[in-house]
Amino acid sequence: MHGKVSIQTVRKTIRQDPNTRKEIIVCPGGAYATLSAFEGEPVARFFAGQGWNTSVCEYGVEEKARMPGPLLQLALAVAQARRENDFVAVCGFSAGANLAALLCTRYEEAARLLGTKPEAVRPDAAVLGYGVYRFPAGMVPQPAEKFGQVSGQSDLLPKCFRPALRQTAQGDRLDFEALMLEYAAGRQDPSADEWRSLSPAELAGPETPPAFLWTTREDTMVPSEQSLFYAQALWAQGVPAALHLFSRGDHGEGLAEQNPESHFWPEMAHSWLLALIGTES
């Protein structure tokens, strides 16, 4: 239900210390079709180990992914965390990064629908990994090699991913951008206005929270240019944004513990957040 809405609480607390006063809410990826386990609790536990209060937002997927449902679920999670913390950041991956950035750019709308004040649901910062921030880029015909190759394993895919399969001369491939848009819009042929409403790079303003973005050039599911789109949108509005593009690494790395190049990103994000808190205190 949406209106002055009744939204199910989906904030799973991992660590809550009343003396800490700062929290990170993690939004796993999964193309709005599922929630990736290794992009949720493991990430929250890393930041908990760095002294943060942490939680995971288990937002709606598949038929429950239609906006503004997940947007309001994350907004409610931020509002809950805000009662217990002075600084609240959101951290998302892939579709979760899209969702986190959407709240950063649509928090006033979310507050209105929840019947609360914008400052209650506005994150103080966002940490975003390999997300989609401008959907029209994924809606134009693309070369087959743009999509992530499934290498003949399409029969092993979860059913929720099969709508994204594209037959190519090289084999079955996944178009994650199109799949995310379909689930978030709730239909296969969203209008131009719906494209824009789901594209944070089109919605950024001077009050959009600062962001730390990271991605890899080898990502075949979501082009690395997507992160540049959002960073440029923030820079154009005078909003601080850090963009880290690693040369190697696949989509969906999470903590990237097996990647010798990008596994530093969590420490980098932690340092960036502490510096941001220092400038705001």
Where are these regions (language model features)?
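Alpha/beta-hydrolase superfamily serine-hydrolase fold, recognizing
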Residues: 1-281
